[in-house]
């Protein structure tokens, strides 16, 4: 029990559990003895009905759309705290992750197109390396425990949120044909209600969560990635203390263990089980995986580093206090972990064209993401001193 308590008290414990869950999923998805059970579990239908409203999704989508909205709620709370009171409190500091995210989307896409522009079919996958899997990127960072300055974690969160918002916009504009404007209208009303609650000084967290559920349902029905609702709710929950209590900080404290030890490991288990059937190393010589690997492994850190350097030179932004430019470069490498978000975009780009293209894309995403994780983790482990 003493060793167990020590493990869960460690800052790295959440990241370790997430990686174990991901490895277990890969083994089960590619083992003849367990692959059937694994996929049956993910395809288990779960239905929720309230009056005439019905949400009928399989287990995988409930994990990705519902549980991960809670993760994004926590991320929204943490980023808001830093924007209001912490390392991103000034306009130029807050602009830094925005500029970094823009570079981290543009350069990987251009690098991918450098390989695939001549092929009108594979060209459609240009957005694949522009995505970052925030959960796995933070999971790798968590493996370093207390070595990692909080400000660096917040910078990665802020950058990845903007990256995810960019990916959601890209999906909506280029890969979605059936957006529901009525549902988007309901979502807009829910956001307006959240704003009014905040302006009126309402401090009951439950009220925000209730409106957040309406917002999540509307965003889900609209065809846009539903996890976006979590970030929005997090930004509206009051942060200021009154009588020594802050609703945002209190909720952040409550959510953290649930996210670290249940939601993120479940997400990893549900999404890391990529079947390697039909995937061969010979495919690495094709322009599709080469473009993805180049975009994730080279384009991400290059784009983030270049745009950050330009922002500093032109005095458009400031480095977050307590960080170095070299640390920002390594965060750029970790942002090359595209994984589930990249696989999702690949399925949208090639799902109706050729299943073999999806296999090649998966190969490129796995190689690029794993390489980014290993290099980023190793570099930070060498450069960051353990806290005493």
Curated annotation (Swiss-Prot):
Matching InterPro entries: Na/H_antiporter_dom_sf (IPR023171), NhaA (IPR004670)
Keyword Disulfide bond attached: no
GO cellular component, one term: plasma membrane
Protein's cellular compartments: Cell inner membrane
Keywords: Antiport, Cell inner membrane, Cell membrane, Ion transport, Membrane, Sodium, Sodium transport, Transmembrane, Transmembrane helix, Transport
Pfam families: Na_H_antiport_1
Family: Belongs to the NhaA Na(+)/H(+) (TC 2.A.33) antiporter family.
Alphabetized NCBIfam families for the sequence: NhaA (TIGR00773), PRK09560.1 (NF007111), PRK09561.1 (NF007112)
Protein known as: Na(+)/H(+) antiporter NhaA
Protein's organism: Shigella flexneri
Gene that encodes the chain: nhaA
